[in-house]
Amino acid sequence: DRYAIAAVWGVESDFGKAGKKFYLPQALSTLVCMADRRQAYFRGELMSTLKILQRGDLEAADLWGSWAGAFGHTQFMPSTYLRLGVDGDGDGRSDLVNSVPDALHSTANYLRKSGWATGAGWGYEVEVPPGYSGPSGRTSKHPVSFWEGHGVRKVGGGGLSGAGAAGLLLPAGKGGPGFLVFKNYDAAYSYNGSDAYALAISILTDKLKGKPGVQGQWPTDDLGLSRNERRELQRLLTARGYDVGEPDGAVGAKTRSAIMQIEAQLGMPQRGRPGMKVLNALRAR
């Protein structure tokens, strides 16, 4: 899907304009020595960087990217570069830094290997009925008929459609937009491991196709949280006995479930959204 590939390119590097702030051998060596966790992971990425040089795909001067090691037009990690990088321009090398065809063909290869089905959509915007109390989340997959039975409807009217199981995504809680997401959304999610990222890719894909943007209204009465504030929220939830995983600021199903339980205890609307209201409530306890 050329629109999805273009969306990844735009989000990752502003079409090749950004993402070249750190020299990878130095950045990854620092992470190997200084990172509190994942030292083995970064050691592997450093070794992969050296293998790319040894293979002759790039010169040392090309190795500029993000602080965590991602680089090239579509910001591959070095190990992903070795595993999925392809030659798109026929010169015998996989050069994701200087060759746009190589970068875009490699991104297509990544999405395909992650399960992206050409011609199938990622999902679409939906509305949930007032008082909805059913399941939600990317991994809570059910047939379309299940969601129809729970009163979920397409924005703008019309019945639900799509083959295979889908998850109901409520990124801003029950008071914001909703999305029914399918297998292609999971492929976009695998690129970065974040619903915010996968939604950005998916919505931009639709916009590039000329489709309308999000119709639902995002909440404005409860400020969102910075990454550090999301980490603080997760630490506070963990201290109260909730299993939210590593307090890394990435909000997944466990964090949203814990937020909803805390909201119920505090007599707040159960939205599952990591906002300032629930953070301040936990700070005050």
Feature annotation, model-predicted:
Residues 225-230, 238-282:
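Short acidic, glycine/serine/threonine-rich helix-capping segments at coil-helix boundaries
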